[in-house]
Amino acid sequence: MGHDPEVAAALRRDLPVTSDELGPKTYLELQALAGVLPFGLRHYWKGHFLRALDADTFEQLVQTVGDDDAVGAAFILLEGMVGAGRTEPDGGAAFGQRAAAWNVSALAIWESPEDDDVAIGWSRRVNDIVAPLSLTGGGYVNYSPVDESAERIRAAYGDERWARLLAVKRRYDPDNVFRFNHNIAPA
């Protein structure tokens, strides 16, 4: 996976450019990007881990961004899964998507509650485009929207990891004190 100048040139040519941050980034640079989003914005992020990203799906994603029918800022995050994220021994951590080649997530970010339906709808449409290529039916839990289904949260971990997480929850948080995230109920 690396930086392909031809792919970068095609993206810059075919999409309206509002900000050009395309290119390799260190982990530190990636983490610093979070500072560009001020407090108070509304967010709805949804995606899938994919085995592969084929040309037809990529074209649909480009078209969806080009349609620009979302309000505020609409991004499609394409994260290549490389390095340690793919080489951790099976069962070594809670992250269950080691076989994925890509994490593809739609990020809708806007200001006004009146725009909720349009922005959330855009993110869900992007999610529907990549769903047929999904590795497990689950997305990255840290990007999951507040209305994420229990089935998709479980699919993100896989059955074996889910069982281990339930056991940890039962042992260390039986009263479900830590419930304000994408909850794993102790029962």
Features from the language model and the residues they span:
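Soluble FAD-dependent oxygen oxidases
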Residues: 1-187
